[in-house]
Amino acid sequence: MKLLFDANISWRILKLIENEFPNCLHVKNIPLNQPATDNEIWNFAKENNFTIITHDDDFEKLLLQKSIPPKVIILKSFNQNTKQIATTLLAKKEIIESFINNEELMILEIY
């Protein structure tokens, strides 16, 4: 399960979830000119089999325009610090795995 964290989520989250979510990246660590555009992030995720995780509704719009892959997880849990977001993701690991493995689903909102 490969998650690509958008710039609006701290890169520090990777260390907090690495045991349960290996092979994740933050957009600041991908080989694109920074700051990468949403389209560039989308294309990287598509070419490298990542699911994008973000607070940004712009990826929902891209998903509706382009379809999958990649899949998109939108965090609707605003005003949470990185540790709280990590705790939420760890608690919802089974839901996230099920979403990624279900070929019919395109978007997951996590509250």
Model-derived regions, located:
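C-terminal structural segments of small proteins and small subunits
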Residues: 70-111
